[in-house]
């Protein structure tokens, strides 16, 4: 996808034109959701976080704001919005949810639903010190360029898995986060 000039209207049109394929919803898996925040600009951005190095799981990794569904969450979307508010102070009412991508199975046993939402450019992010060490924005056109992701095939717990790897500035984007970004790129019609 040679979309260095990808604008928000093009992104929205493509996303809404090509609806994600229905996917299985595993009732026996723990559920989680992440917000995939698209920053509303003429050349939109993709908001990402770097997890605190002090966390027990996925410490220091680049991620979307999100986490496990809890009993206060009415829906997966509500869980993603709550977690985004807790982790980086994005007010739920500031997010225009435009859809969801197919759920992804995590290595920690969760089924994670990516919730795609548009956020205003003038938000003041406040990273939760317990969970987030950095908040940064990547140009959406660059994030959705499939050629920037490189595959790595790994064998874990008796199964073969493909994970995707990429760098942006000094951030290493890989695993589930890179996979979700690639899925979003494919959803809007990018070709490998």
From Swiss-Prot:
Please indicate the residue ranges that the annotation assigns to the motif Nudix box: 67-89
Q: Which cofactor does it need?
A: Mn(2+); Mg(2+)
State which Enzyme Commission number(s) the record gives. Answer: 3.6.1.-
- Where Mg(2+) binds, per the record, is at 83, 87
Question: What's a GO biological-process term for it?
Answer: nucleoside diphosphate metabolic process
| A Pfam short name | NUDIX
List the CDD domains hit by this protein, alphabetically.
NUDIX_CoAse_Nudt7
User: Matching InterPro entries, A to Z?
Assistant: CoAse, NUDIX_hydrolase-like_dom_sf, NUDIX_hydrolase_dom, NUDIX_hydrolase_NudL_CS, Nudix_NudL
Keywords attached to this Swiss-Prot or TrEMBL record, sorted alphabetically, are: Hydrolase, Magnesium, Manganese, Metal-binding
Looking up SUPFAM superfamilies in the UniProt record yields: Nudix
* Ranges of residues in domain Nudix hydrolase: 29-160
A molecular function (GO) term: manganese ion binding
Question: PROSITE patterns annotated for this entry?
Answer: NUDIX, NUDIX_COA
Record function comment:
Probably mediates the hydrolysis of some nucleoside diphosphate derivatives.
Q: Which family does it belong to?
A: Belongs to the Nudix hydrolase family. PCD1 subfamily.
Q: What is this protein called?
A: Uncharacterized Nudix hydrolase NudL
């Amino acid at each position: 996808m040679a979309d260095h000039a990808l604008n928000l209207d093009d992104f929205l049109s493509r996303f809404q034109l090509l609806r994600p394929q229905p996917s299985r919803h595993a009732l026996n898996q723990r559920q989680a959701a992440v917000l995939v925040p698209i920053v509303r600009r003429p050349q939109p951005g993709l908001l990402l976080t770097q997890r605190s190095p002090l966390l027990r799981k996925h410490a220091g990794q680049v991620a979307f704001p999100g986490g496990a569904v809890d009993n206060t969450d009415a829906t997966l979307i509500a869980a993603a919005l709550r977690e985004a508010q807790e982790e980086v102070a994005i007010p739920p009412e500031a997010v225009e949810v435009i859809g969801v991508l197919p759920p992804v199975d995590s290595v920690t046993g969760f089924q994670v639903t990516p919730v795609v939402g548009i956020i205003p450019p003038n938000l003041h992010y406040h990273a939760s010190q317990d969970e987030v060490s950095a908040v940064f924005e990547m140009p959406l056109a660059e994030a959705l360029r499939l050629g920037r992701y490189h595959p790595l095939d790994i064998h874990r717990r008796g199964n073969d898995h493909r994970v995707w790897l990429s760098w942006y500035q000094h951030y290493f984007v890989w695993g589930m986060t890179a996979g979700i970004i690639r899925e979003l790129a494919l959803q809007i019609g990018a070709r490998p």
